[in-house]
Regions:
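A shared catalytic/ligand-binding motif for oxyanion handling
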Residues: 1-129
Length: 129
């Protein structure tokens, strides 16, 4: 399916009555979390999703990106800084942040992964187990 056709279909299915998520408020933070169930086949979906792209920080789990993957450059998302904890099949997390959010700390184990981002007044911690 062509990119423009897919985008039109997504926009057509959006609610015409915007909620809090859709309104821009100064001083508000939008945090999204999603089990992506393999990042590679869903990267394009992520890059054109108008709802997710309103988030200031996007936490994804079950990325399935291997530690020895040649590069995470193909998983970059325009307008966001990407951070990955690569563990392999069925595991791993990715965080896309923008604005004042910056990576602070990671915990990486085979059976769980944790990452922490902060904007100075708010910490966003993503735990996948």
């Amino acid at each position: 399916m062509r990119y423009s056709v897919l985008t039109q279909q997504i926009n057509r299915s959006l609610n015409n009555n915007p909620g809090e998520w859709d309104r821009l408020f100064v001083g508000k933070v939008r945090v999204a979390a999603l089990n992506i169930a393999r990042l590679q086949p869903h990267m394009r979906d992520l890059s054109i999703d108008p709802t997710l792209l309103k988030a200031d920080i996007i936490h994804l789990c079950e990325t399935w990106v291997c530690q020895d993957q040649e590069s995470t450059a193909r998983f970059e998302l325009e307008g966001y800084t990407a951070h990955f904890i690569n563990v392999g099949n069925g595991r791993g997390i990715a965080t896309y942040s923008r604005g004042d959010f910056h990576h602070q700390q990671d915990v990486k184990e085979d059976d769980f992964q944790i990452t922490k981002f902060s904007n100075g007044t708010l910490d966003s911690i993503h735990i996948y187990r």
